[in-house]
Structure formats: structure tokens, C-alpha cells
Swiss-Prot record:
Superkingdom, taxonomy of origin: Eukaryota
PROSITE patterns: BPTI_KUNITZ_2
Gene Ontology, cellular component aspect: extracellular region
Residues of the site described as Reactive bond for trypsin: K47, A48
SMART domains, sorted: KU
Protein name listed in UniProt: Kunitz-type U15-theraphotoxin-Hhn1n
Length: 88
């Protein structure tokens, strides 16, 4: 009975590895670059008006940032946005 449990555990871990390993290697998770750049523009919660740039899936687009909150798809310049999000 002990060997059956060990074999079951090894089989389970092997299947888990085979299922999750490709996801870990995919571009969607490569150093967070794609995930951040896929976020929508988010103005944030305040009423200030700062010109910022976000990546819209194709290029960087200007938007008005309220000054607080929002998400990480927010860059001070178009150049910074493209450097972070444009595909090589």
C-alpha cells in the first residue's frame, strides 16, 4: 500500500508538471512585460490631469491620469511605454 501511494504521488506530480510547465515558459508571463501591457488604461481615483501613456495592445496611446491609483500600464512618455511594451 505504501508503494501505491508513492506511485500515485509521482504520477500526480508528473501530470501537474506537464500541465503547468508550458504556461511558465509562455510569453504571457515573461518577466511581467505582457501582463502589465495588457492592462486597460486606468485614470485612477483623483481629479488631477497628468498626461500619461498606456499600451493598447498595438501602440502607446495618450490618456489623462488623475494622479493616484490606477494600474501599472501607465508611463510618463511614449518612449518609455514603447520601450516596456513593444514587442521586439
Amino acid at each position: 500500500m505504501g508503494i501505491a501511494r508513492i506511485l500515485s504521488a509521482v504520477l500526480f506530480l508528473s501530470v501537474l508538471f506537464v500541465v503547468t510547465f508550458p504556461t511558465l515558459l509562455s510569453a504571457d508571463h515573461h518577466d511581467g512585460r505582457i501582463d502589465t501591457c495588457r492592462l486597460p488604461s486606468d485614470r485612477g481615483g483623483c481629479k488631477a490631469s497628468f498626461e500619461r501613456w498606456y499600451f493598447n495592445g498595438t501602440t502607446c496611446t495618450k490618456f489623462v491620469y488623475g494622479g493616484y491609483g490606477g494600474n501599472d500600464n501607465r508611463f510618463p512618455t511614449e518612449k518609455a511605454c514603447m520601450k516596456r511594451c513593444a514587442k521586439a
